[in-house]
């Protein structure tokens, strides 16, 4: 029996049998031939269901890939701008190498800039010449080793969030 399905969780919207989807990062369009859930085949599924999708074409889909509607494309870039809460005792400074975990994918990244820290009492931007200290809120810029596809956090917190990991300790 020749079955090739791709399993994952729907992070937003609805997927329907017969719908055209775009596989990212491959950039290949295909059609959803079938949708399977724990209860069997269904015509449509929605967030946050776990599904197995059967696609009409062989496409390069692996851990961390996204299947999206061509009409509602996420952002995609190696240069990211983010608001973060720094939760490590060693200050976060420009040039620091980190691992960025986004959905189910982990990629190497480097902090290119600390734009500012936020004063917790006023939420006003403050200079951060020493970087971000433990529990600081701030805005940073990162460059990743490969493109990340994302939505704004206010739109979709599953695809609009990430965590930074210390490579040597996994902190």
PLM ranges: what are they?
Residues 2-171:
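C-terminal effector/interaction modules appended to NTPase cores
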């Amino acid at each position: 029996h020749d079955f090739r399905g791709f399993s994952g969780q729907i992070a937003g919207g609805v997927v329907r049998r017969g719908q055209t989807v775009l596989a990212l990062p491959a950039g290949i369009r295909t059609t959803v031939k079938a949708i399977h859930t724990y209860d069997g085949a269904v015509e449509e599924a929605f967030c946050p269901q776990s599904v197995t999708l059967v696609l009409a074409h062989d496409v390069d889909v692996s851990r961390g890939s996204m299947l999206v509607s061509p009409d509602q494309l996420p952002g995609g870039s190696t240069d990211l701008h983010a608001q973060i809460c720094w939760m490590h005792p060693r200050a976060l400074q420009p040039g620091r190498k980190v691992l960025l975990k986004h959905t189910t994918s982990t990629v190497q990244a480097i902090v290119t800039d600390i734009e500012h820290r936020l004063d917790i009492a006023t939420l006003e931007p403050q200079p951060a010449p020493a970087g971000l200290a433990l529990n600081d809120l701030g805005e940073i810029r990162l460059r990743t080793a490969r493109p990340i596809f994302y939505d704004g956090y206010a739109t979709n917190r599953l695809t609009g969030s990430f965590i930074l990991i210390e490579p040597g300790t996994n902190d």
